[in-house]
């Protein structure tokens, strides 16, 4: 049985391993950079592990195989579940224990909803970017960009409402978020580290995967900062601000 599985496996280059066996469903194969359509040629330093020319059904099935999109997909799918779980926890425990107002519930709900939309749109694009229809791929890419915009909106809604409510003491938290975002963007545009290790980081450790993980870290940091500022605001109101109302 073990020998049969090895015979039916697709062999990939995984780091220093030249022939690493990967089982893929029937109808799915992994391509090299030279074999994929132009629309998928974004990073020449990722040389192998591409999915391409798949119908929707097989795109979904490819969620459970090892490809160069696996980390990109699962990092944001798990990110979605993280923010979904945080939403339930915030609404049932964190906000009530802080004697949060109706406005707090609304702001935190908007923030976490935006983060979840961002994660799901990203998952959708990276899952269906291998679709045989280039038009479908471009639609999912547009949704991915829209999701990024919605995620940024979630940051600004809570930021405007809380961060500078009374003073600028919370500015360092905002700065940290932007530093993480900048770091993620630098990995994205520089294509480091795979630029220095072509073909060695096709499946794990590429710049886009680091970008995805840092995006989750950034949004999680912003959520934690929002909760922190909300709790601080309720425990230590701003008398100077209130006196001028």
What do these predicted ranges mean?
Residues 1-245:
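Multi-pass alpha-helical transmembrane bundles in non-GPCR membrane proteins
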């Amino acid at each position: 049985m073990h020998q049969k599985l090895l015979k039916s496996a697709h062999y990939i280059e995984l780091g220093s391993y030249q022939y690493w066996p990967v089982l893929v469903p029937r109808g799915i194969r992994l391509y090299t950079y030279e074999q994929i359509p132009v629309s998928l040629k974004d990073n020449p330093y990722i040389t192998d592990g591409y999915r391409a020319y798949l119908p929707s059904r097989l795109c979904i099935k490819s969620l459970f195989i090892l490809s160069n999109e696996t980390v990109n997909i699962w990092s944001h799918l798990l990110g979605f579940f993280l923010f979904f779980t945080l939403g339930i926890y915030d609404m049932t425990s964190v906000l009530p224990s802080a004697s949060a107002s109706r406005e707090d519930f609304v702001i935190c709900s908007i923030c976490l909803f935006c983060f979840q939309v961002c994660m799901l749109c990203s998952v959708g694009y990276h899952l269906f970017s291998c679709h045989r229809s280039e038009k479908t791929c471009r639609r999912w890419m547009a949704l991915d960009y829209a999701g990024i915009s919605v995620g940024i909106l979630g940051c600004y809604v809570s930021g405007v409402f809380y961060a500078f409510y009374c003073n600028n003491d919370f500015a360092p938290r905002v700065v940290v978020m932007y530093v993480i975002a900048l770091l993620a963007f630098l990995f994205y545009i520089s294509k480091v580290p795979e630029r220095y290790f072509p073909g060695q980081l096709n499946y794990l450790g590429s710049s886009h995967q680091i970008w995805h993980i840092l995006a989750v870290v950034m949004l999680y940091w912003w959520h934690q900062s929002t909760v922190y500022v909300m709790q601080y605001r309720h425990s230590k109101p701003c008398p100077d601000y209130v006196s001028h109302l």
